[in-house]
Amino acid sequence: MENIQLKKQIKSMDKVLFIVRGLPGSGKSTLAKSLGSVHFEADMYFMEGNEYKFDITKIKKSHEWCQNQVEISMKNGNIGDSRIAVSNTFTQEWEMKPYVDLAEKYGYTVFTIIVENRHGGVNVHNVPEETLNAMLNRFETKLI
């Protein structure tokens, strides 16, 4: 019953930003696509047609691109539906700050969602196990 009430409350909100966090393969992208009318993630920067071409030297640029896309969407009022979802690993709190700042600037309510891999999701980007473990070890949660 509480989930239904929360859904109704969120749907009635004018401007919402969903920040979807989790390790690679957890299902962030799938969830984010279902939440917002617009969805962004840094991985989109590496898409060439239908092919994903990751380049570690461009990681900073990919995150700048993602933040810029979110801001453009917020500025434009997201053309009729102001629900935006951004999904990245966001393993540390400071990585979300630029998005929280944008939300404050443009009057968006922020919901942060942590996606766990309880469904046995596959790591589609072939991130090595040791990298996943390092990401898990630095994953920060700040509960009030």
Task: List each model region and its residues.
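The conserved Walker
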Residues: 24
